[in-house]
């Protein structure tokens, strides 16, 4: 039993959310889908396009069942950090991980602001109980230099935040606006002005730094970066701030820079490999029982976030109920009406809370607090600690480092020392050993231990492994939000991110980690399995949605119909389904405080994403499975400004769709062009029917189908006539035209 749960005052409460009306709506739409399928079967004409429609609609029905399961029983968790007051001395240590991979796509100032917000957290004895580790997979001296400068700045920034109760402790965000000063705020005004000046100096030092100069004039501090290549270098670990008692007492958390060893002969497993290296390095330096991981662009927005997390990690009667605490991804400076459909507000409130009511929310890769022993692969139940007693068993799981095996045994059996390490610099040499690129060979790292390898979405796969071991997880929603980041803007960044996620999901779906197999042979609950499938089938939706989208143009071009005509009873089923589904989606957005425009933007982006990012992800993974290609981890550019008053005239107009020469735009551009051509040809046929009395094939349903696609693909159609970054490149246009020509030829021959 957790120590905190034995107290008189509760730390958390699980609150079910009633949704009776929504359940009725779920069932009503399911009934209409089944009725449409029944109509198809009873009125089967044998036409291939109608049977294709039946197959697609059967898939949509299956997708709706998964959606209903995910939303059926939502919950929220309320936390009461004020009740931790009587247990201050019992609060455990936390190791905080920040990952960055590319100093160009993820500028050092972005990472610096995230780190500074972590160093300024409100937590008892933060200097002793918190430690911040930064993984730099780019092995950049610029990143290391920026973090060293950040540590110096933190000596004044952290006391300023605590003295004045600063709410948002990422300097770029805090200084983006000027607070209102009163007559009695003289001291605060003086401090604020000084800190703003110091931050501007920090920004200039980091932005003016260049790699050759650092290597030449760094006084030997950056000698380890000489002659290194990004994918071929030894381990570099630097203790940038060691807050031991002999020097400063209770100041701010330790700060450690880590760039793990890489070799071109060994796979480094992207972010999952970096997280596993950080886990081992931190185990030998501070070995906190809990870990927080953040992407480099997700800064702390609520300085009490660790206290809230402890309410969940310590507040249940047993540990099984909370293996990890996931916070929702929130975005600052979000564009009005969510033009790119990537703010995920409704998905969180509807699907996220629903999954939280099952075995628990998914691990989303950032903003998550973990139990270290769960990451080490510990199972639930009586057999949880078996396999950790002998040195041979520990070696097969964790590797050859005796120091690490001893630290792992301490975590698993709860034998952690309450005395802080006096000098973590003395641990650097042994820490380098476990960050070596060949350390994991012959061990369980990446499989049963640590972050799981084998998918571009290593985070979700790792969470599934934890759930499969019998653990549960919790969703932590607090005000103000725990962490904030910046959502990708423009077309390329959004679609690149979605393609990466979809590729990772499909890799899991067709692998031995498939949740159906995990439910059959392990402890993943059935409804949790369906919840995972709800996400994993994202890319599988693409061929079905593409097929259904092509049926409208095909029928208009070949004078056929695939939807019931107005004279058929099935027309009213299809019409009722169309109205019910769109009304359902609209009401979801309204209930979540979103606008009608936001609802339309999200629906539009789903159609664009399905015909672009998801489709390309589907094809990429299929080709990889057949041995024709490899999936590649693509880092999403971080677009946020990190200096006060920064204005970049090269940035695109907010909310406007931008394009590049990525192949992701080819199929969706072709589909947009095809829909317009089909409507034009269909309208011409209507004129012939009216004037010459020719028999007509397609009905109004096919026109509505194509017209709806035209509305959804309007950003692409505008891109066809746009210029610069707002115009679709000619190479994409020509390839799209070729696809359209092939489809027109197909329609003519059929």
From Swiss-Prot:
Similarity annotation: Belongs to the glycosyltransferase 2 family. Plant cellulose synthase-like H subfamily.
InterPro entries assigned to the protein according to its UniProt record, in alphabetical order: Cellulose_synth, Nucleotide-diphossugar_trans
Species whose genome carries this gene: Oryza sativa subsp. japonica (Rice)
Principal place of residence: Golgi
Function per UniProt: Thought to be a Golgi-localized beta-glycan synthase that polymerize the backbones of noncellulosic polysaccharides (hemicelluloses) of plant cell wall.
GO MF: cellulose synthase (UDP-forming) activity; cellulose synthase activity
UniProt keyword terms in alphabetical order: Cell wall biogenesis/degradation, Glycosyltransferase, Golgi apparatus, Membrane, Transferase, Transmembrane, Transmembrane helix
Protein name: Cellulose synthase-like protein H1
